[in-house]
Amino acid sequence: NLNYKNEKQIEFHRKELLKIYESCCLENTVPFEGIIELLEEINSSGLAWGIVTNKPIKFAKRIVDHFLSQYKPNFLVCPESTGERKPNPAGLVKACKLVNSKPSLSYYIGDHLIDIQAGKRAKMITIAAAYGYIPPGQSPLDWNAEYIAETPIQIKSFIPELSK
C-alpha cells in the first residue's frame, strides 16, 4: 500500500510524464504493419468499428485524427467517456451501444491481458493481438482469448463477415 505522500509524488510524476508525452505522442508512432489493409477491408464490409483505449482522450484523439481519420472509426471511447479504465468493461459496453451491437456478437481485439479481461467481462468475442505491445514475461496464449492473431491480416479469418 502506498501512503498519501507517495501517492502524491506518483501523481506529480504522472502529470509530468503526460506533459512530455503530449509534446511527442506522434513521434515514433505508426500503425502496425497490416492494420491499414485490415481497416480498408472492414470499411468495405460495412462493419462498424472503433477504438476503446485507456489512453486519455487528448492523446488518443490526436493519434486517431493523425493516423486513422480517413478510415472513419465509428467511435473513440476513452476513460473520460465512462469514468472507468479497462479491465472494467464499461468502455466496451458503451462502444457496443454506440453502434447498436450486442456485445455477444461483437469482437474486441487487444494487445494486453487487461484488454482481453475487459472483453470477457463485456461478454464479447476476444482476439489477442500477438503482434502488439506484449509486456515482457507475458504470452497471449495465457490470456484465454477466443482467438490469437499473429498479424492484423489474420484477424480477417476469425470474423465471418471478413473471411468471405
Where in the sequence are the language-model features?
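Short, mixed-charge, low-aromatic patches
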Residues: N1, R14-K19, A48-N54, D111-D115
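Asp-based, Mg2+/Mn2+-dependent phosphohydrolase catalytic module
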Residues: P56-K164
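Low-complexity, intrinsically disordered/propeptide-like segments
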Residues: K5, E41-I42, A95, E161
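A metal-dependent, Asp-based hydrolase signature
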Residues: N1-S23, E33, E37, E41
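Pocket-edge positions in alpha/beta enzyme catalytic cores
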Residues: L2-K5, S23, E27-V30, E80-E84, ...
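Secondary-structure transition/capping residues
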Residues: Q9, N28, F32, Y71, ...
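Short, acidic loop-to-helix structural element flanking the phosphoryl-transfer center
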Residues: S23-I51, I57-D65, P89
